[in-house]
Amino acid sequence: MLLSVAMGLVACGDDSSSSAAVEESSSSEPVQSSSSWTLSSSESRVTDSLSSSSVDTSRVNSSSSLTGTSSSQAGEPGDTTRITYALKRFDGPLTNPHKGFTVPTEAAWTFDPGFEYGPHGSLNNGAWNLVTYGSGYQQWNKLNPAKGVYDWSELEELLDALTAHNMGYALRVFPYSPSFIRDSNTPEENYDWTPKYVYEVGAKKITARYKDNNANAAVPVWDDSVYLYYAKEFATALAAKYDGDPRIEYIDVRSFGEWGEWHVSNLDGSKMPSVEIQKDMLKHYASVFKKSLLVLPSDGYGDVYTYALSLGITKRDDCLIGIPGTADSLVRAYEANMPTVAENCGGYAIMLNYTDMIPGGYLKWTPERWVDAITTAHLTYYVLDQDFDDCGYRFYNDNKELADSMTKVLGYNFTVESAELVTVAGAKDTTSTLNITVKNTGVAPCFFDIYMVAEFVDSTGRALAQVGETVRIPKGTFKDDSSQNFSFTYKVASGKPDVAKQSGVSVSLSLYESEDAFKGGKNPTVRFDNDGLQGNNKLLLKP
């Protein structure tokens, strides 16, 4: 029952589009190819046609084969045949890049076979089959141990391990973590992760009371001019190192407060800086990060939230489910056409024991509330479970079917709903046109450019010729719950070899993150939610 509910809850968005012609290399045989696409929604319809006189004959590896069946149509010009393809949804969980679930990945040791909850551990933790990016935290004082000195070595080791497992990373650098304040005698460096040199050159700190255990603790003065100067200097260095790095999914702006969450609710005596200072920090981050997605932490609200959106900085919330209405707070970012990010109020095991007492407590985790949080907030990025101990092991064992289904709801999810190949043989040429309809059945747009390619392939899956042109779909334009129609045309002059007529030839569809990846012969990285996916991530159409 929950599976059907999860798959049915999607939201509507406005549609807009643009498309650019893509030049392909010429083949040895003269053919003409063109592509067009149409956006279908209740508000707009746009058609953009592309044309050229070229075809790509790049090769791929695949072990699948398919021969189409055809039917002739009377009354149409020339000798017309049609192949209508049978389409079904992909059976099982479906992960895709730049969206999805995460679990804590503290360091490269997460991938060591000796860690039983890791992807190679003895427990065979199935949660990792749903994980598309790692998350955790870095300490400012470790990355920046001295003035002008930066040590990225441990972070680089983690990024390399994640890349080897086809995962990105959500980067969060904390200046402070009260979680490690045990008592009033706890060494400051255990929880205050502001580099020592910042204080040595004049930044101020105060003593505050940690409400969790009444311990006295040192806390930075968040609006101190020296602190602000070096917080910005670190941001500049971080951008110089990682802005635009494809291994990074997004970067939180974590300059203030407990865990860098822009609040000091557990530190009696500490105060957040003014709204203007908060805005100024966001402005600085936006000025040095030109490519990577930036995220405003959970407690950035009101004017700060509005200002962040104006800078292209999206929003996260770290207390979904537990506090009523938190998912609604992310709708503003979704409506600004930005990906939304979230965690829950606590780990799965903890949230099962919440009392449902509001006020005075938190709402407990239930499957219905989990689905509602994802769909209400139109989430693109979400923690599967934030328990650092078991990396989602218990959660996944308890909720496998539902969790698998939500991989196709979270973020974008492209499904080919109809596909037909129409071939018209005339006196001068033969034209084959592939018409398809694709729907985004997820709860959010796709927030990166995607490149759609149609190809004729032989019985081994080897690409013989590109059908039409590569179609670029700009980021943010393929809205959730919207459909788009695409046409790919391949024309061959009479008397010239026509690969479409060769025995065993079929059609494949592919989605790439870049045009260069296709031209370079790489496999696509984005997968359709359809039966017929090959080992190289291409979709083989079946009649």
Name every feature range the model reports, one short phrase each:
Residues 134, 238, 251, 285, ...:
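Conserved, mostly hydrophobic/aromatic
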Residues 77-226, 345-371, 379-396:
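N-terminal substrate-binding region of glycoside hydrolase catalytic domains
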Residues 78-118, 163, 250-390:
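Catalytic-core regions of glycoside hydrolase
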Residues 142-144, 177-183, 257-263, 302-306, ...:
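Short catalytic/ligand-binding loop motif for oxyanion handling, primarily in non-cytosolic enzymes
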Residues 3-80:
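Bacterial Sec-dependent N-terminal signal peptides
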Residues 204-227, 234-271:
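Active-site groove signature of glycoside hydrolases
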Residues 408-543:
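Extracellular/luminal regions of secreted and cell-surface proteins that mediate adhesion/ECM remodeling
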